[in-house]
């Protein structure tokens, strides 16, 4: 990975953007039949020229999200997902390429759009080949409210001395 990350304490901040993200997570959870979730951590990514994010998953999270604040013109390092069916695809003979037969799928992202996905889904970002930075705000969710979490877990995620709201 090449890029900058900043951590923020979502429990101490109540920006309209985070409230909107939580509302979107509530709607998404309802649509897919999940229990409600709460945003448990957030950060921002600045992907400079030549930067990329390797394939990864978000362990100990239910739903993850990425909001694209600023997309430069051109080949800005698209968001991709890895098919969870990859290990089971034997002898695929597609007539044409579709998301159903692909190992990797480049998600057609747009500026100022929020993308939610199950945290177990492997994903990453292609290389930013533009002269400008690509900015995103990302977050994870938990099936528990912060007050229900073990204080040791809270400290490991948000740091020593974190106070519940």
State each model region's role.
Residues 40-42, 63-65, 135-139:
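Hydrophobic residues positioned within well-ordered beta-strands of beta-sheet architectures
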Residues 86-88, 158-165:
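Short, cationic low-complexity segments
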Residues 13-51, 56-60:
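N-terminal onset of structured domains
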Residues 45-116, 126, 143-155:
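Catalytic core of non-heme Fe(II) oxygenases with the double-stranded beta-helix
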Residues 1-11:
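Single conserved hydrophobic/aromatic residue that forms the stacking wall/gate
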Residues 126-136:
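Ligand-binding loop in jelly-roll beta-barrel domains
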């Amino acid at each position: 990975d090449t890029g900058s990350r900043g951590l923020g304490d979502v429990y101490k901040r109540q920006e309209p953007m985070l409230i909107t993200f939580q509302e979107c997570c509530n709607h998404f959870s309802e649509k897919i039949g999940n229990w409600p979730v709460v945003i448990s951590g957030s950060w921002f990514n600045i992907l400079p020229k030549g930067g990329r994010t390797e394939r990864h998953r978000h362990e100990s999270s239910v739903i993850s999200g990425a909001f694209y604040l600023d997309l430069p013109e051109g080949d800005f390092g698209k968001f991709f997902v890895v098919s969870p069916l990859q290990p089971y695809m034997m002898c695929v003979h597609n007539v044409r390429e579709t998301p159903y037969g692909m190992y990797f799928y480049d998600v057609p992202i747009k500026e100022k759009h929020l993308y939610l996905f199950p945290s177990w889904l492997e994903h990453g970002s292609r290389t930013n080949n533009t002269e400008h930075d690509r900015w995103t705000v990302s977050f994870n969710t938990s099936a528990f409210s912060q007050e229900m979490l073990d204080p040791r877990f809270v400290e490991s995620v948000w740091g020593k001395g974190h106070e519940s709201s």
